[in-house]
Design a protein with these regions (language model features):
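Rossmann-like NAD(P)-binding element
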Residues: 24-28, 39-101, 107-111, 116, ...
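Short beta-alpha connecting loops at secondary-structure transitions
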Residues: 15-23, 135-143, 167-172
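Internal alpha-helical scaffold of NAD(P)-dependent oxidoreductase catalytic cores
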Residues: 140-170
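Short, structured coil segments at secondary-structure junctions
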Residues: 12, 118-119, 161
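NAD(P)+-binding Rossmann beta1-loop-alpha1 motif at the extreme N-terminus of oxidoreductases
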Residues: 1-36, 59
């Protein structure tokens, strides 16, 4: 899922840093992105030059500290509340003040995820549908304390990357 989200941003000309816990996972993720772009080229939907330019916008790291100055982080780990809370606690420590911390959860309580941080006003759900680089629907999930400017930014960014953003509240299963 993370690779498709990365591609959605790169396809819109936005640079992305892919974080994985280890080099093996990072190499596999970047290779899958490369394979997806190669498939798109082979189908004649992109030139090799376009695919290469987009792929060049995606860098990788295994170090959370590389996210210190980013404006937005989208977490795309598996659907475990414990894991998501651990990730958000770490993001809270390393990301700059005002950075938007988004979860790609498809059904977990964004309020509970936000509670793992000291800045619940900056936490939002951004649920991409699979494959994220193809599917256009994007659920923007407002938690109880999500700030209005975070919602506005998420909605505008969804449009910028070619998605159809739909605002939802926290509920089991959201919209999709």
């Amino acid at each position: 899922m993370g690779g498709g989200i990365d591609m959605s941003f790169a396809n819109a000309g936005i640079s992305v840093t892919l974080l994985e816990l280890n080099q093996k996972g990072l190499d596999a993720g970047l290779a899958l992105i490369g394979k997806n772009y190669a498939t798109t080229v082979s189908k004649g939907k992109l030139s090799q030059e376009q695919a290469s330019a987009r792929q060049a916008l995606i860098s990788g790291t295994t170090d959370y500290e590389a996210l210190a100055d980013v404006d937005l982080v989208i977490e795309a780990v598996f659907e475990s509340m414990d894991v998501k809370r651990q990730v958000f606690g770490r993001l809270d420590e390393v990301c700059k003040e005002g950075a938007i911390l988004a979860s790609n959860t498809s059904y977990l309580d964004v309020n509970e995820i936000a509670a793992a941080t000291s800045r619940p006003q900056d936490v939002v759900g951004l649920h991409f549908f699979s494959p994220a680089n193809v599917m256009r629907l994007l659920e923007v999930v407002r938690a109880d304390k999500t700030a209005e400017d975070v919602i506005a930014t998420a909605m505008a960014l969804g449009k910028r990357i070619g998605k159809v953003p739909v605002l939802a509240g926290v509920c089991y299963g959201f919209i999709g």
